[in-house]
Amino acid sequence: LPAWRDVTAEQWADAQWQRAHCVKNVAQLRTLMGDLLDERFYADLERDQAERATMSMLVPPQMMNTMVPATDGVMPGAGAAFTEAFYADPIRLYMLPVFSDRRTDWPSHPFSTRDSLHEHDMWAVEGLTHRYPTKVLAEMLPTCPQYCGHCTRMDLVGNSTPQFTKLKLAGKPVDRYAAMLDYLQRTPGVRDVVVSGGDVANMPWKNLEGFLDKL
């Protein structure tokens, strides 16, 4: 990709470099891809972000690099050929949905909601979903290293978009974790705790380790 031609193998393998160079908006994608993509793709993505997107953009370099892989060592040519391949790429479809991807002729399911799994409705304390008698889900944080365009936890995860205001965790992390542990101590029937988020890859190791030790 044009903007990363001079990146070293050491930089590429560095998790902090990957985080620092995530694609977060259309302008950054344009800088990265250069003339590989036609203008119509950028316009399509920009319209989706303004009118339909439920997730903000956050795509790390490694994920961008998996889109439109070379076939027998040959990449599609810049412009129309690469743009068509980019539109058709399954990872692009999942990570960077555009306006033309969305089927407006198919209505949403009648029971479709922002929180389709009703996790928030079943919070025992903030961030702890107790749906089944012996199992709970601990949502430790509302962020991920990358944002999938069709996240099933979109009500909580990521930044708000022009048409979608996200649910915000009100408590401080240390207070939320303490409340979760207190509830679990008072609920001995729970045997299975799924520690999730967001993605715990974004959680400082000492905080995750401290929670698991107490758990």
Label each PLM-derived region with a short phrase.
Residues 104-139, 150-215:
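Conserved Radical SAM active-site core
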